[in-house]
Amino acid sequence: MSTVNVQIGLHELLNGSNAQIQLSVPQLVEKVLMRNEGKLTSTGAVSASTGKYTGRSPKDKFIVKEASVADKIAWGAVNQPISEEHFNKLYIKVLEYLKEKEELFIFKGFAGADRNYRLPIQVVNEYAWHNLFVHQLFIRPNEEELATHESEFTIVSAPNFKADPAIDGTNSEAFIMVSFEKRIVLIGGTEYAGEMKKSIFSIMNFLLPEQDILSMHCSSNVGEEGDVALFFGLSGTGKTTLSADPNRKLIGDDEHGWSDNGVFNIEGGCYAKCVNLSHEKEPQIFDAIKFGSVLENVVIDGQTRIADYNDTTLTENTRAAYPMHAIDNIVLPSVAGHPNTIIFLTADASGVLPPISKLSKEQAMYHFLSGYTSKLAGTERGVTSPQATFSTCFGSPFLPLDASRYAEMLGEKIEKHDAKVFLVNTGWTGGEYGVGKRMNLGYTRAMIQAALSGELAKAETAKHDIFGLEVPRHVPGVPDEVLMPEQTWADKDAYKVKAIELANEFKENFKKFDSVSEAIINLGGPIA
């Protein structure tokens, strides 16, 4: 099947009598309620459930193995190949399925807040609530932009269409397929809305580096003087909490590009975790959940329609989707200058990494590639040993290219723009998990404040004798002994054993990067 035929099929779908194009937020909310896809909560948000898929389904994600990209993609467990034949046949079936629907919902918008690099996209949805979701998550066009909008990538989403693995070449009924040649994302079998958001991010992680733009899985904010900070970190490291600063404006909470002009948000909204959400802890997110926002898999009281953010009956991965303008203290459009400060956040449950350390360019590239944090394995059975988790570039599931490409670009940009990089441990101190305690949030905030102000750039440091990190000897508002992790352990020998154990896990993980330069390994990694 040719690309021409594919485009004809899509053209027919987009121009069918059932196509509802660019409905407003109130219209979409009405459709959601009329079609019984969700409920209205006490704050006016739409609440929807995603059925059995309450998170991303990485084993069901594929990239079509096409001649134009075959030698560019880092094929493997993350980027699984699927044949053009399988994709084409499944695509035709999905189009035929959607043509029969009473209504389809179509959103046209952009990914990328910098107008020089934005990607015009369109999304075809079987569900009205999914269309409301993409309306809030991507960048919405004004009337003039909509009139001239020509999509360069299309998401076709049919959650109720189930694949047959025996025929369709999939691993299950669910599928998320990207064809770079046909500029199509095909999603079916899963109702989890995050698949649409992350598919576009994966696409941008392929397209932006080709324009010499580093795509990044991070949050970012900007100070009153125009100083920009990036926060990288895996789930549970405090990225959202620490980047929400009343004295700084939010550029974005999750996906960014770094071009020759500076930093820009890829999205037009936020997709925030809301497990245990409270107004006291995270007022910005709490107050954003209002009319037009979408709650995903949050338990709602049947009578009062009040959301119970502590109830994880459906999943711990409860989410809220809302547009950037739903929160105060933001930059619009979501663009800013070059980063002055880059923070890598890790929650080290072994309690051996310093609470803050300065990184050289090589160390920054090493820790960027490593993407380390801890997961607590088996705590429900009383097992207290933490499990080291490494997610390349703090975003392994979304990187189509070889990881070294992103690391090299980061190194070049750090050097060119003299960005200062810090590794911040928000995990344990005074011992590993079960012995020590979680790092004091007030201390972490003080350390980040000192990094952002430029104070730590000139601070006196001591080299960590196992990890080779430069640890500040003094940070205002933080006891000096807290800065040196060994000093917080009662058993100094036990600290050394645990630190060497973690250093070895870093080294073992790094063996997979066979295309990385020797300088990054020799100058960036542990020294013991």
UniProtKB/Swiss-Prot annotation:
Keywords: ATP-binding, Cytoplasm, Decarboxylase, Gluconeogenesis, Lyase, Manganese, Metal-binding, Nucleotide-binding. Its main location: cytoplasm. It is found in: Cytoplasm. InterPro entries: PEP_carboxykinase_ATP (IPR001272), PEP_carboxykinase_C (IPR013035), PEP_carboxykinase_N (IPR008210), PEPCK_ATP_CS (IPR015994). Substrate binds at residues 56, 192, 198, 319. Its cofactor is Mn(2+). GO terms for biological process: gluconeogenesis. ATP binds at residues 198, 217, 233-241, 282, 319, 444. Mn(2+) binds at residues 198, 217, 254. Pathway: Carbohydrate biosynthesis; gluconeogenesis. It is an enzyme of class 4 (lyase). It catalyses: oxaloacetate + ATP = phosphoenolpyruvate + ADP + CO2. PANTHER family: PHOSPHOENOLPYRUVATE CARBOXYKINASE (ATP) (PTHR30031:SF0), PHOSPHOENOLPYRUVATE CARBOXYKINASE ATP (PTHR30031). This is Phosphoenolpyruvate carboxykinase (ATP). It comes from Bacillus mycoides (strain KBAB4). The lineage of its organism: Bacteria, Bacillati, Bacillota, Bacilli, Bacillales.
